[in-house]
Amino acid sequence: MEQVPVAPEFTHPAVEEIELAAVLHALSDPQRLRIVRELAANAEPLACGSFALDVGKSTRTHHFRVLREAGLIEQRRDGTRKLSVLRREDLDTRFPGLLDAVLSA
């Protein structure tokens, strides 16, 4: 029987591994900040393709990777879709008030 390749799971930093410099760098890009704002406004996970970003697929993938590796979002696969959710509780634990300050600016 032929084996079907399985996509690797996403890696996410643990709460104590989230670094302020990485979070601020990720939030410094207008497209990534837009993604975070949309995720903050939705309680349910959103598919990467549901964001109205005026960028190509590889750039979109890059932005989500930066957000995930910084610890801002958590991603999981749902069939062929990648669902993203904001790690609000983890960020509030690590950096109290930071996310609210950024989102209200």
What are these regions (language model features)?
Residues 1-4, 92:
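Generic N-terminal simple sequence motifs
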Residues 3-24:
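Short, Lys/Arg-enriched N-terminal segment that forms or immediately precedes the first helix
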Residues 16-20, 83-105:
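Conserved segment of winged-helix/HTH DNA-binding domains
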Residues 21-56, 78-90:
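N-terminal helix-turn-helix DNA-binding core of bacterial DNA-binding proteins
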Residues 29, 63, 96:
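Conserved acidic functional residues
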Residues 49-72:
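Canonical helix-turn-helix DNA-binding module
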Residues 75:
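Short beta-strand "wing" residues that participate in macromolecule-binding interfaces
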